[in-house]
């Protein structure tokens, strides 16, 4: 559990290894590049920036640590 920490936006980082209990997939954050003047910019978050990890029990606790680490 020593590598369990929060990633960008105070969401669980890769060390937490949260998995979807139904699909068994690891959840990872993604980044995207926005090219201006080509397409409209989305003004709402798509979920990866949220502080709670997809409702699977992984959330940030005190001192921005994942709580609980074992999802």
UniProtKB/Swiss-Prot annotation:
Disulfide bond residue pairs: none
Keyword rRNA-binding: no
Keyword Metal-binding set for record: yes
GO molecular function: metal ion binding
InterPro entries xrefs: Metalthion_15p (IPR000347)
Positions in coiled-coil regions: none
One Pfam family, short name: Metallothio_2
Entry keyword set: Metal-binding, Metal-thiolate cluster
Record-stated family: Belongs to the metallothionein superfamily. Type 15 family.
UniProt function note: Metallothioneins have a high content of cysteine residues that bind various heavy metals.
Name of protein: Metallothionein-like protein 1
Species whose genome carries this gene: Casuarina glauca (Swamp oak)
Gene that produces this protein: MT1
């Amino acid at each position: 559990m020593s590598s369990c920490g929060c990633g960008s936006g105070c969401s669980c980082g890769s060390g937490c290894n949260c998995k979807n209990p139904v699909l068994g997939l690891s959840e990872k954050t993604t980044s995207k590049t926005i090219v201006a003047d080509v397409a409209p910019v989305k003004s709402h978050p798509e979920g990866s920036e949220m502080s709670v990890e997809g409702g699977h029990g992984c959330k940030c606790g005190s001192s921005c640590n994942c709580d609980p680490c074992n999802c």
